């Protein structure tokens, strides 16, 4: 009888310890979640205030993006963005968060808005900049602080609008992910009523730093206001950026006389295309 009573007491103590450990673990998890949410709130504030030095503390020295950018390259890009768009404001929303010890994975949806500091010599106004992205951040705890060691951008779209392009509803349709060496189509659409007074181009470039910029070849849109191009992705599995440029003329334009053409609107539209390695693909030479 004494044995069973002792065993019963042992079980009660064991269950109590397990419950305490479970509560302690849950509390620790809750604390880490709060820390990471505050981390991204502080990141959003630093981005919106253009505090580059503060922002650097959020990133590990061995940071690397899925585009192959290191910390130095990343902050050169940030610096250029702040220089050309000093009023930029970011919004970051956490979509999912997972913590495993000293490691965390966070998926965010972010948007940014700004105006260019310089006016266009063509349209005479400052451009409106819009950015939207879905990104997975991989964090590691360094002492008491979290730092970003890697990030993978799943989706990213950017547009820069001058003049009448600010009022035109425009769509750039491209896949977010394709296999290396495969064809994919890109479609650029504007409302049909603008089709006769606009020209557009579509090109694609590999995402590298410093950026490579291929030549724009402008073409007339069809009567529905569409322009389409088919590309083949690179076989090096490097991510690509599709760029559509739009020029909207005023009055009744004569596209055979480009020198006298009066441009009232300009637009640049960028969309990321992530390239997935193809099994057994040969390396491009």
Predicted regions and their residues:
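Surface-exposed, charged secondary-structure patches
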Residues: 79-129, 136, 232-241, 247-249
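Short, well-ordered alpha-helical segments enriched in acidic and aromatic residues
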Residues: 46-69
């Amino acid at each position: 009888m004494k044995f069973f009573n002792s065993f019963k007491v042992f079980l009660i103590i064991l269950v109590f310890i397990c419950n305490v450990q479970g509560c302690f673990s849950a509390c620790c998890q809750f604390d880490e979640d709060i820390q990471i949410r505050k981390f991204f709130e502080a990141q959003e504030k630093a981005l919106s205030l253009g505090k580059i030095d503060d922002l650097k503390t959020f990133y590990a020295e061995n940071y690397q993006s899925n585009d192959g950018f290191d910390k130095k390259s990343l902050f050169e890009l940030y610096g250029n963005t702040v220089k050309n768009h000093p009023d930029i404001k970011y919004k970051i929303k956490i979509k999912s968060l997972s913590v495993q010890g000293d490691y965390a994975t966070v998926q965010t949806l972010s948007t940014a808005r700004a105006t260019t500091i310089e006016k266009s010599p063509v349209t005479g106004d400052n451009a409106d900049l819009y950015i939207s992205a879905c990104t997975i951040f991989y964090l590691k705890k360094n002492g008491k602080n979290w730092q970003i060691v890697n990030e993978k951008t799943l989706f990213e779209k950017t547009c820069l609008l001058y003049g009448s392009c600010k009022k035109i509803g425009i769509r750039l349709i491209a896949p977010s992910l394709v296999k290396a060496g495969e064809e994919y189509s890109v479609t650029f659409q504007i409302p049909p009523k603008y089709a006769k007074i606009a020209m557009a181009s579509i090109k694609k470039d590999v995402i590298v730093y410093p950026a490579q910029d291929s030549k724009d070849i402008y073409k007339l849109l069809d009567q529905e206001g569409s322009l389409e191009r088919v590309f083949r992705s690179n076989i090096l599995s490097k991510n690509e950026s599709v760029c559509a440029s739009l020029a909207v003329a005023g009055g009744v334009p004569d596209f055979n006389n480009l020198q006298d053409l009066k441009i009232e609107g300009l637009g640049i539209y960028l969309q990321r295309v992530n390239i997935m390695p193809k099994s057994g693909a040969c390396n491009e030479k």
